């Protein structure tokens, strides 16, 4: 046989051999369920038709397969991206960094925590009815505060989505605000207790009129203390901060102070505009409020507003959010030559984080202070409440301990123990003066919600007495039947054997103060006393604190020893 005659036979044999190999490979792949990647290289290299047919089945435009290089050390599961591994690790550690703290840019979240942001968004959309679209964020470690610049709220939207029904006003509210009570009842009857566009428009006109009246009364100090909404704008929102703001009705609802005499625009709290303060301030974070060193007396009002909905999943008592305003009269003394010679105690306002995912305001006494202060990282104070009285130093404690006024609600979890007083810790220097004026009633809740729990109950008994290191405080409402309409008041405390008692008759027009200074061991150390009174209709509670001169603490100087205060 010649080589030419054997060529067809060899070609046929090669074809049969390659066909047999191809069938064997297909059988192996079908039995094992694996791809050619698991086939020995020696076999694939010797089967050219199989390699060409496999290459024909692959999509040349398909992206390359991701390499899963991130492996979980707990369960050895691999991931292609590091953030996927971090998210998976939370299933082992039970870490939940995403908290439902803000809804639509407002601090009304319920506080629930989630391990993934998509679960948080789904929770807010389902539970809180938040229509905010899901947006992918760069960071997956925590949920930052969403920007409010994209929030658009109008009266039409608020009217179409009622979130809370306004409670009925009680008999005390009828007595205190008869015109307001009648107007509210008519609105509640027509709108079933929900917000409506017409009601909001009426409230807008009322608030604007109230603000104009307030600014007219305080025209002499309006430029520094009560700027209008056109003067200031919220830098976070990028819109005017007042009745013209689209978010104004989310901040000033029915729970705002409804009395024009003490109304104040919310833009008073503009922590983005530090003003020039006196030379004694070193921390710029404390320079957050307008201040004039030449001012004699300034009146600041704190508007307490109620969120539109109680956060889901929270057992919040009606006392938890309040509706009232605190007016702080801050007198300024004639300053001596330097800051070290200033010896005066004033009331300051401090915004603190709240355990209910909402800011709070706390009243504090602090020496050598002429400013309002606010932590640099605090939230907005649109929704505020008085949770607790916090004292900066022993020399500035009040006789009432942590309860500064009947309108101050202090939950048990936030209650702080009263500080210990001694003759050397009594405030010294010139006699200082501070005044707090708080309405006892509310337009929002029935009367059984006030006074707040932990102070004086509706039957006139103190709920929790304060006794600490020689200080005993007892308070009693003398006329239980007319608790708010005509309220009597009595308080007494004992300081190092010195008895002091203040009493007020039922009509609110007589005050008796008994002070027994002869029991003092050191005649130069006179304990402070407080003057408590009510107006005739019982709507307001006031307390004047007087801290006399103390020679024992050594804070008096030659420059201010004989200098009288200036109001």
From Swiss-Prot:
UniProt keyword terms in alphabetical order: Activator, DNA-binding, Metal-binding, Nucleus, Repeat, Transcription, Transcription regulation, Zinc, Zinc-finger
Region ranges (Disordered): 1-67, 123-154
GO terms under biological process: induction of conjugation with cellular fusion; positive regulation of induction of conjugation with cellular fusion; positive regulation of transcription by RNA polymerase II; regulation of transcription by RNA polymerase II
Biased composition (Polar residues): 12-55, 140-154
Pfam families per the UniProt record, alphabetical: zf-C2H2
One CC-aspect GO term: nucleus
Places the protein is found: Nucleus
Protein origin, superkingdom: Eukaryota
Main location (coarse class): nucleus
Residue ranges covered by zinc fingers (C2H2-type): 70-92, 98-128
GO MF term set: DNA-binding transcription activator activity, RNA polymerase II-specific; DNA-binding transcription factor activity, RNA polymerase II-specific; RNA polymerase II cis-regulatory region sequence-specific DNA binding; zinc ion binding
Ranges of compositional bias, category Basic residues: 123-139
PANTHER family found in the cross-reference section: KRUEPPEL-LIKE TRANSCRIPTION FACTOR
Main function: Key transcription factor for sexual development. Activates the transcription of ste11. Binds to a stress response element-like (SRE) region in the ste11 promoter.
Protein name per Swiss-Prot or TrEMBL: Zinc finger protein rst2
Organism: Schizosaccharomyces pombe (strain 972 / ATCC 24843)
Gene name of the record: rst2
């Amino acid at each position: 046989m010649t080589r030419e005659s054997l060529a067809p036979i060899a070609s046929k044999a090669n074809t049969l051999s390659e066909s047999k190999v191809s069938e064997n490979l297909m059988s192996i792949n079908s039995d094992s369920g694996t791809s050619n990647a698991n086939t020995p290289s020696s076999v694939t290299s010797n089967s050219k038709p199989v390699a060409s047919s496999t290459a024909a089945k692959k999509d040349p435009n398909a992206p390359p397969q991701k390499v899963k290089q991130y492996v979980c050390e707990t369960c050895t599961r691999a991931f292609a991206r590091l953030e996927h591994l971090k998210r998976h690790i939370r299933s082992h550690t039970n870490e939940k960094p995403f908290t439902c703290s803000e809804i639509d840019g407002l601090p009304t979240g319920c506080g629930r925590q989630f391990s993934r942001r998509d679960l948080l968004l789904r929770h807010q959309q389902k539970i809180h009815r938040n229509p905010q679209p899901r947006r992918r964020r760069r960071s997956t470690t925590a949920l930052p505060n969403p920007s409010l610049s994209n929030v658009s709220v109008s009266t039409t939207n608020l009217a179409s989505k009622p979130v809370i029904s306004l409670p009925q006003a009680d008999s005390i509210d009828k007595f205190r605000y008869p015109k307001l009570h009648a107007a509210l009842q008519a609105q509640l009857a027509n709108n079933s207790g929900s917000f409506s566009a017409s009601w909001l428009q009426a409230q807008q006109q009322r608030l604007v009129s109230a603000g104009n009246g307030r600014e007219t009364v305080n025209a002499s100090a309006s430029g520094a203390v009560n700027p209008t909404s056109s003067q200031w704008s919220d830098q976070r929102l990028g819109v005017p901060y007042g009745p013209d703001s689209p978010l104004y009705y989310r901040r000033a609802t029915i729970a705002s102070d409804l009395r024009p005499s003490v109304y104040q625009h919310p833009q008073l709290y503009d922590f983005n505009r530090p003003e020039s303060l006196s030379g004694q301030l070193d921390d710029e974070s404390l320079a957050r409020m307008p201040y004039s060193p030449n001012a004699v007396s300034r009146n600041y009002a704190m508007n307490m507003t109620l969120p539109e909905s109680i956060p889901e999943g929270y057992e919040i008592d009606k006392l938890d959010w309040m509706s009232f305003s605190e007016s702080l009269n801050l007198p300024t003394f004639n300053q001596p030559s330097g800051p070290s010679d200033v010896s005066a105690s004033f009331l300051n306002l401090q915004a603190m984080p709240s355990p209910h995912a909402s800011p709070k305001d706390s009243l504090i006494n602090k020496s050598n202070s002429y400013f309002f202060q606010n932590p640099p990282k605090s939230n907005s104070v649109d929704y505020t409440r008085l949770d607790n009285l916090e004292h900066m130093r022993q020399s500035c404690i009040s006789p009432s301990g942590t309860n500064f006024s009947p309108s101050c609600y202090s939950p048990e979890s936030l209650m702080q123990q009263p500080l210990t007083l001694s003759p050397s810790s009594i405030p010294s220097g010139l006699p200082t003066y501070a005044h707090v004026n708080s309405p006892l009633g509310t337009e929002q809740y029935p009367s059984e919600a006030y006074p707040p729990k932990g102070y004086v109950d509706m039957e006139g008994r103190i709920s929790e007495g304060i006794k600490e290191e020689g200080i005993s405080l007892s308070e009693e409402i003398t006329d239980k039947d007319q608790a708010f309409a005509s309220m009597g008041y009595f308080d007494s405390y004992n300081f190092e054997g010195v008895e002091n008692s203040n009493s007020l008759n039922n009509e609110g027009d007589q005050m008796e103060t008994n002070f027994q200074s002869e029991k003092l061991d050191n005649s130069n150390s006179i304990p402070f006393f407080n003057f408590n009174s009510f107006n005739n209709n019982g709507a307001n509670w006031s307390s004047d604190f007087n801290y006399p001169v103390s020679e024992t603490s050594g804070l008096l100087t030659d420059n201010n020893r004989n200098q009288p205060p200036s109001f």
